[in-house]
């Protein structure tokens, strides 16, 4: 919560069987924040994040254990034209409106349904100046290409519509969301 320029937060110690024990808390939070660490014993980290995303109806912010110098000043929107990506843009509009720079990144753009220029025009109507950027994955994964481009534009946050492919397919084959969770040092704001 932000009041008079000061922010506040509450922290809860959750008792019970993870990941389901977090659901009642996650549903009433403004945002769910997870700090990624390499030292998690006996807990499937991606299950915890998936539960927060699928079962809370709230945004989830994943940050690495390295504290960033800034956050939400230079935002990358990972745009694939999906309903989840559109929802992510809508839910983060206040952040986008206050950012110093916004970039819409598409990877291997193949169609008009996820044309970054059309999204930029829509954002402009909401007071957000966004720069469309296309890139190719080539031999790298989509998440690697996305991270590389985000680093190049000095992004301090990536906004993504999480799990835009079905949950089972993402669990079996991986996917951009899951790959970003494990590889990005840039904070990721995920919306499903």
Give names to the regions the model predicted.
Residues 9, 13-17, 57, 61-69, ...:
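A short, terminal or domain-edge coil/loop segment
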Residues 81-133, 137:
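Redox- and metal-dependent alpha/beta enzyme cores, enriched for Fe-S-associated oxidoreductases
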Residues 24, 51, 94, 118-121, ...:
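Alpha-helical scaffolding segments of alpha/beta enzyme cores, especially the outer helices
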Residues 40-41, 109-113, 137-140, 166-167:
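Short, small-residue-enriched loops and turns at beta-alpha junctions
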Residues 46-49, 117, 146-147, 172-177:
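Charged helix-capping and loop-helix junction motifs
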Residues 2-32, 127-158, 162-171, 178, ...:
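Structural beta-alpha unit
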Residues 20-106, 183-192:
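Intrinsically disordered or low-complexity boundary/linker segments at protein termini
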């Amino acid at each position: 919560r932000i009041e008079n320029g000061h922010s506040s937060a509450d922290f809860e110690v959750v008792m019970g069987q993870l990941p389901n024990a977090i659901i009642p808390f996650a549903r009433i939070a403004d945002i769910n924040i997870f700090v990624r660490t390499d030292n998690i014993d006996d807990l499937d980290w991606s299950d915890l994040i998936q539960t927060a995303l699928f079962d809370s109806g709230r945004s989830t912010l994943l940050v690495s254990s390295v504290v960033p110098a800034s956050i939400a000043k230079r935002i990358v929107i990972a745009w694939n034209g999906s309903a989840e990506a559109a929802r992510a843009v809508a839910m983060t509009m206040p952040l986008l409106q206050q950012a110093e720079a916004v970039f819409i990144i598409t990877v291997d753009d193949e169609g008009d349904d996820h044309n970054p220029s059309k999204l930029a025009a829509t954002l402009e109507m909401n007071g957000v100046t966004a720069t469309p950027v296309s890139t190719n994955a080539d031999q790298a994964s989509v998440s690697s290409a996305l991270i590389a481009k985000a680093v190049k534009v000095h992004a301090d946050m990536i906004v993504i519509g999480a799990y835009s492919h079905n949950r089972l397919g993402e669990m079996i084959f991986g996917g951009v969301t899951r790959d970003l969770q494990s590889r990005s040092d840039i904070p990721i704001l995920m919306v499903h």
